[in-house]
């Protein structure tokens, strides 16, 4: 007998939606921009962190100021079959650049450096409002869409040829937070959020806990490129074309987000930014990985501990709150 989810997969639809409004919170109280079913595919676009779209049109009255506000999000998407204690699987079919410019802050965040290092870095030569209203700390970048190269418009240059291959990613992705709590798209947590994880790229599959009927899925904050840790406090901020497919996993309760790509399975631990060291997020990610290995890959507890102790990798996702625990998939296909 076909289950409801099997029938949804058989009659899956592709929905194209380009919202003319946004949200800045991961909340179940926001009005959905679309109702979709498990198995459906959505084609959409995201604005940059300042609210500008692929044509340079600015959709926000006020600039982003942490933590009172947040990155503009597309969503929420209401997933009809999702309910509390399920998990939501989101496969990123496409994450593509759609304009030829972006921007970053001009130097590393002082909190990422040792005492005195920030002061001896370099002064800001950039003008107020040059890139975004009420911001004087931003550098514009040129994005070569044909060759997929990013280059900063530097005022001070050396002989160094500064051009980098792009790797488009989504900084914000997740579901509505648990209970009645309403969090802006500035922090990250068990629901996802502003994780700024540079493995959230085309081809990745993400898994999120579901805390409310409908899940209320959001995405936004596109980056053309970003290093581990988001040391600048930004990636190369830009707008994106995105296509994703959703699937509900009934009764598959999760405690934190997970990510699967061609090479790794990944547990993502987040904690309130600036409130504690990243060791708490690391412990969350490690604990979830142990559970994943024993419950879904059916390793014994000794096997899971020994595998993690010998082949685990870690990523500092953001310097202020998120850490990823990675296990190579080649050790799990035996």
PLM regions with names:
Residues 44, 87-90, 208:
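A generic structural signal for residues embedded in beta-strands
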Residues 55-70, 74, 102-114, 219-237, ...:
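Short, compositionally biased
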Residues 96-198:
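Intrinsically disordered, low-complexity linker/loop segments enriched in Gly/Pro
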């Amino acid at each position: 007998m076909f289950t409801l989810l099997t029938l949804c997969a058989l009659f899956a639809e592709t929905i194209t939606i380009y919202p003319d409004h946004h949200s800045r919170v991961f909340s179940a109280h926001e009005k959905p921009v679309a109702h979709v079913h498990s198995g459906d595919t959505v084609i959409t676009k995201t604005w940059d962190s300042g609210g500008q779209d692929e044509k340079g049109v600015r959709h926000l009255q006020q600039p982003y100021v942490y933590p009172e506000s947040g990155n503009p999000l597309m969503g929420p998407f209401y997933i009809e079959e999702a309910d509390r204690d399920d998990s939501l699987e989101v496969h990123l079919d496409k994450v593509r650049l759609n304009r030829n410019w972006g921007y970053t802050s001009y130097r590393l965040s002082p909190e990422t450096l040792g005492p005195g290092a920030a002061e001896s870095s370099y002064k800001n030569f950039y003008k107020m409002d040059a890139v975004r209203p009420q911001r004087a700390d931003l550098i514009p970048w040129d994005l070569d869409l044909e060759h997929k190269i990013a280059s900063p418009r530097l005022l001070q240059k050396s002989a160094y040829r500064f051009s980098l291959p792009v790797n488009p990613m989504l900084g914000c992705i997740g579901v509505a937070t648990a209970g009645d709590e309403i969090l802006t798209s500035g922090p990250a947590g068990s629901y996802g959020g502003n994780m700024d994880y540079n493995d959230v790229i085309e081809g990745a599959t993400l898994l999120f806990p579901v805390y409310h009927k409908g899940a209320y899925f959001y995405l936004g904050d596109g980056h053309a490129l970003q290093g581990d840790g988001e040391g600048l406090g930004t990636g190369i901020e830009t707008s994106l074309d995105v296509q994703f497919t959703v699937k509900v996993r009934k009764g598959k309760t999760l405690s934190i987000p997970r990510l699967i790509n061609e090479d790794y399975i990944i547990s993502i631990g987040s904690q309130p930014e600036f409130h504690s060291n990243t060791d708490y997020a690391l412990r969350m990610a490690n604990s979830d990985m142990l559970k994943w290995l024993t419950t879904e890959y059916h390793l014994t507890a000794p096997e899971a501990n020994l595998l993690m102790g010998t082949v685990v990798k870690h990523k500092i996702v953001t310097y202020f709150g998120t850490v990823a625990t990675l296990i190579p998939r080649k050790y799990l296909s035996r």
